[in-house]
């Protein structure tokens, strides 16, 4: 029997999506955002493929034929999983694809911020070097990576992959996770002892704004905060104030609370030498995206074969 499959935001994945191994009718759209568009485009579809399209309870109620939501990402906070479960809809996600791309982005942000690479490069373009009385100048502090301490909040597969890279660079690694593991420390230790802190936890009601003004004040004044996970983990207003006040040394963010920031965002709009914001691309190396695309199709094919894999529980 032919299955109707719809990819609602194909533009979000720059990789080849191979043809399915079962009889199917396939349709893709570059982007889909409004509930009305979602419902219209998924009429009669059994399988929805999405990346960041919001699948809320009111929308799902209007899609009686839907049986599978295949998310082209690890995070599934865009899906109302409880509503999906109640309606008999299976939700699957992508796992273990970003083992190089995200850690490398974290390390890149760490080097850029600790070594003040961006502000110094910008100063050269402004002509500051031409005007210098010496062969160099020290407008922005530079700190070594080797010998410094990395604090990892969320010690899953990505956290462990980053830890290996950090140790190879000569860093001391501290890690915190809500799930007990040998060798972990508490959050207070991470905040007070780390030179660089990187976040790798999902966005849940418990983790929303887990880093706010109180936590930022506990960090070293030279410390760097890196977030390549979810924007809602950090109170952005508190972070911006901390950067302006010198409460912490800098921040590197690949995510913000609302994406895309169509109405502006205080971090994206800020002009600070100690802040780097990239447009949610830490996951998006060419290699990683192809691994993701292949696994996305694998997930759909496994479901159709009656052997669902990578199922996300409500």
UniProtKB/Swiss-Prot annotation:
Signal peptide: none annotated. Its EC number is 1.1.1.29. It is an enzyme of class 1 (oxidoreductase). It catalyses: (R)-glycerate + NAD(+) = 3-hydroxypyruvate + NADH + H(+). Keywords: Cytoplasm, NAD, NADP, Oxidoreductase. It holds the Pfam family 2-Hacid_dh_C. GO terms for cellular component: cytoplasm. It comes from the Bacteria. Disulfide bonds: none annotated. Its main location: cytoplasm. It is found in: Cytoplasm. PROSITE patterns: D_2_HYDROXYACID_DH_1, D_2_HYDROXYACID_DH_2, D_2_HYDROXYACID_DH_3. The keyword Ribosomal protein does not apply. Plays a central role in assimilation of carbon. It converts hydroxypyruvate to glycerate as a key step in the serine cycle, and may also play an important role in C2 reactions, by interconverting glyoxylate and glycolate. Uses both NAD and NADP. Homodimer. This is Glycerate dehydrogenase. The gene is hprA.
């Amino acid at each position: 029997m032919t299955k109707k499959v719809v990819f609602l935001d194909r533009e979000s994945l720059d990789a080849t999506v191979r043809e399915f191994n079962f009889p199917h009718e396939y349709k893709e759209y570059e982007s889909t955002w409004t509930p009305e568009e979602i419902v219209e485009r998924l009429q009669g579809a059994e399988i929805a493929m999405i990346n960041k399209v919001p699948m809320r309870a009111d929308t799902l109620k209007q899609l009686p034929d839907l049986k599978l939501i295949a998310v082209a990402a690890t995070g599934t906070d865009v899906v109302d999983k409880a509503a999906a479960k109640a309606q008999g809809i299976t939700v699957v996600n992508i796992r273990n694809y970003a083992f190089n791309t995200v850690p490398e982005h974290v390390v890149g942000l760490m080097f850029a911020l600790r070594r003040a690479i961006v502000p110094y490069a910008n100063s050269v373009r402004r002509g500051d070097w031409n005007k210098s009385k010496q062969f160099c100048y020290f407008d922005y502090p530079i700190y070594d990576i080797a010998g410094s301490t990395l604090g990892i909040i969320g010690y899953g597969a990505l956290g462990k992959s980053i830890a290996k890279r950090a140790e190879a660079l000569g860093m001391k690694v501290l890690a915190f996770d809500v799930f007990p593991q040998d060798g972990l420390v508490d959050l207070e230790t991470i905040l007070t002892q780390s030179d660089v802190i990187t976040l790798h936890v999902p966005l849940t009601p418990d983790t929303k704004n887990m880093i706010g003004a109180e936590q930022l004040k506990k960090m070293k004044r030279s410390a760097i905060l890196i977030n390549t996970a979810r924007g809602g983990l950090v109170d952005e207003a508190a972070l911006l104030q901390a950067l302006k006040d010198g409460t912490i040394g800098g921040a590197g963010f690949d995510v913000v609370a609302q994406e895309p920031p169509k109405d502006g965002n205080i971090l994206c709009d800020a002009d600070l030498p100690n802040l780097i914001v990239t447009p949610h691309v830490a996951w998006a190396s060419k290699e990683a995206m192809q691994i993701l695309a292949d696994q996305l199709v694998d997930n759909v094919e496994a479901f159709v074969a009656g052997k669902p894999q990578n199922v996300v529980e409500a």
